[in-house]
Amino acid sequence: MTSPRKTHPLTKIINESFIDLPTPPNISSWWNFGSLLGICLIIQITTGLFLAMHYTPDTSTAFSSVAHITRDVNYGWMIRYMHANGASMFFVCLFLHIGRGLYYGSFLSLKTWNIGTILLLTTMATAFMGYVLPWGQMSFWGATVITNLMSAIPYIGSDLVQWIWGGFSVDKATLTRFFTFHFILPFIIAALATIHLLFLHETGSSNPSGMTSDPDKITFHPYYTAKDILGLIFLLLSLMSLTLFMPDLLTDPDNYTLANPLNTPPHIKPEWYFLFAYAILRSIPNKLGGVLALVLSILILMVIPMLHLSKQQSMMFRPITQILFWTLVADLLTLTWIGGQPVEYPFVTIGQTASITYFFIIIILMPLSASIENMLLKW
């Protein structure tokens, strides 16, 4: 008799996705981040749900409700810091997951890659709105600065900003709608992640070599379930170490001051995971130009499959492109550093150079190096 695991309509879906899924035998730990992102999402939804039970989305009580959570609610401090640092872990896993996709040519699975890019944008929107909720100084001014960027859109810009704000400034209406969207978006992310998996399982995973692994597959369970559990242990270790020993390492001290529309903080900056995009935005003196560069710095991911001129999928055997890839990583780290610095010499110049380098490597140098490698291999 066939096992109900393989025949029951519900368990059959789980079986085909996580148990009997044919998987390449040679995928490395870089393939762990997909499952870790799933775990991060579960952690964020769970902790967020408990926070929402005690939080009040109102300008007069939001800040004190967060203080109440950390002081008076049982383990409220832990839930809050797990949620805040969980977002950081989420983005660490996201960036590594995207980096792996770029390095090993996973972007050639177009549907999976494009849904992934939409997932990145949705996650960024969710994190931004979550940062506004504690209603500290950086929450308020971050919301004001970033939503104000919409005013750069010709004709409809200023109307659009007022429509988003629900008034003439960031106020009660803005906070309420941001809370609403921050609550609903993680469930949309979960739905998109399911579609992401659906498209992935249509083609199957790629592998480090970039060659087809169709003739040689192993089942996902027990091999990769055990491997994913190891990744999960490292993730939880990192998250709990951060939460219990250095909970405020990645937060801004200004956010412990109640939002005050009459007092601007000396340096308005977002959380660390947005700093690279913020640096690109600031490096262009023109407002509309900056907004376009900001949007393109993320949407460029969708163009990468078209810029792939190499006859090989993976970068594993392409030393010239490997050098460019790691230069791009260094460039992104530089942008992240610059995003947190004040707008003055020499940071402005470094930011502009790093921003130009970012687009130059992706649009010009990588396709060029692929063509050179093809020529050297006489392909």
From Swiss-Prot:
<dbReference type="GO" id="GO:0005743">
    <property type="term" value="C:mitochondrial inner membrane"/>
</dbReference>
<keyword id="KW-0812">Transmembrane</keyword>
<dbReference type="GO" id="GO:0045275">
    <property type="term" value="C:respiratory chain complex III"/>
</dbReference>
<feature type="binding site" description="axial binding residue">
    <location>
        <position position="196"/>
    </location>
    <ligand>
        <name>heme b b566</name>
    </ligand>
</feature>
<keyword id="KW-0349">Heme</keyword>
<dbReference type="InterPro" id="IPR005798">
    <property type="entry name" value="Cyt_b/b6_C"/>
</dbReference>
<feature type="transmembrane region" description="Helical">
    <location>
        <begin position="226"/>
        <end position="246"/>
    </location>
</feature>
<dbReference type="Pfam" id="PF00032">
    <property type="entry name" value="Cytochrom_B_C"/>
</dbReference>
<keyword id="KW-0999">Mitochondrion inner membrane</keyword>
<dbReference type="GO" id="GO:0046872">
    <property type="term" value="F:metal ion binding"/>
</dbReference>
<feature type="transmembrane region" description="Helical">
    <location>
        <begin position="320"/>
        <end position="340"/>
    </location>
</feature>
<feature type="transmembrane region" description="Helical">
    <location>
        <begin position="77"/>
        <end position="98"/>
    </location>
</feature>
<keyword id="KW-0479">Metal-binding</keyword>
<comment type="similarity">
    <text>Belongs to the cytochrome b family.</text>
</comment>
<dbReference type="InterPro" id="IPR030689">
    <property type="entry name" value="Cytochrome_b"/>
</dbReference>
<feature type="transmembrane region" description="Helical">
    <location>
        <begin position="288"/>
        <end position="308"/>
    </location>
</feature>
<dbReference type="GO" id="GO:0008121">
    <property type="term" value="F:ubiquinol-cytochrome-c reductase activity"/>
</dbReference>
<feature type="transmembrane region" description="Helical">
    <location>
        <begin position="33"/>
        <end position="53"/>
    </location>
</feature>
<dbReference type="InterPro" id="IPR048259">
    <property type="entry name" value="Cytochrome_b_N_euk/bac"/>
</dbReference>
<keyword id="KW-0496">Mitochondrion</keyword>
<dbReference type="Pfam" id="PF00033">
    <property type="entry name" value="Cytochrome_B"/>
</dbReference>
<feature type="binding site">
    <location>
        <position position="201"/>
    </location>
    <ligand>
        <name>a ubiquinone</name>
    </ligand>
</feature>
<dbReference type="InterPro" id="IPR016174">
    <property type="entry name" value="Di-haem_cyt_TM"/>
</dbReference>
<dbReference type="InterPro" id="IPR005797">
    <property type="entry name" value="Cyt_b/b6_N"/>
</dbReference>
<keyword id="KW-0813">Transport</keyword>
<keyword id="KW-0472">Membrane</keyword>
<comment type="function">
    <text>Component of the ubiquinol-cytochrome c reductase complex (complex III or cytochrome b-c1 complex) that is part of the mitochondrial respiratory chain. The b-c1 complex mediates electron transfer from ubiquinol to cytochrome c. Contributes to the generation of a proton gradient across the mitochondrial membrane that is then used for ATP synthesis.</text>
</comment>
<feature type="binding site" description="axial binding residue">
    <location>
        <position position="83"/>
    </location>
    <ligand>
        <name>heme b b562</name>
    </ligand>
</feature>
<keyword id="KW-0679">Respiratory chain</keyword>
<keyword id="KW-0830">Ubiquinone</keyword>
<feature type="binding site" description="axial binding residue">
    <location>
        <position position="182"/>
    </location>
    <ligand>
        <name>heme b b562</name>
    </ligand>
</feature>
<keyword id="KW-0249">Electron transport</keyword>
<dbReference type="InterPro" id="IPR027387">
    <property type="entry name" value="Cytb/b6-like_sf"/>
</dbReference>
<comment type="subunit">
    <text>The cytochrome bc1 complex contains 11 subunits: 3 respiratory subunits (MT-CYB, CYC1 and UQCRFS1), 2 core proteins (UQCRC1 and UQCRC2) and 6 low-molecular weight proteins (UQCRH/QCR6, UQCRB/QCR7, UQCRQ/QCR8, UQCR10/QCR9, UQCR11/QCR10 and a cleavage product of UQCRFS1). This cytochrome bc1 complex then forms a dimer.</text>
</comment>
<feature type="transmembrane region" description="Helical">
    <location>
        <begin position="113"/>
        <end position="133"/>
    </location>
</feature>
<protein>
    <recommendedName>
        <fullName>Cytochrome b</fullName>
    </recommendedName>
</protein>
<feature type="transmembrane region" description="Helical">
    <location>
        <begin position="347"/>
        <end position="367"/>
    </location>
</feature>
<dbReference type="InterPro" id="IPR048260">
    <property type="entry name" value="Cytochrome_b_C_euk/bac"/>
</dbReference>
<dbReference type="GO" id="GO:0006122">
    <property type="term" value="P:mitochondrial electron transport, ubiquinol to cytochrome c"/>
</dbReference>
<keyword id="KW-0408">Iron</keyword>
<feature type="transmembrane region" description="Helical">
    <location>
        <begin position="178"/>
        <end position="198"/>
    </location>
</feature>
<keyword id="KW-1133">Transmembrane helix</keyword>
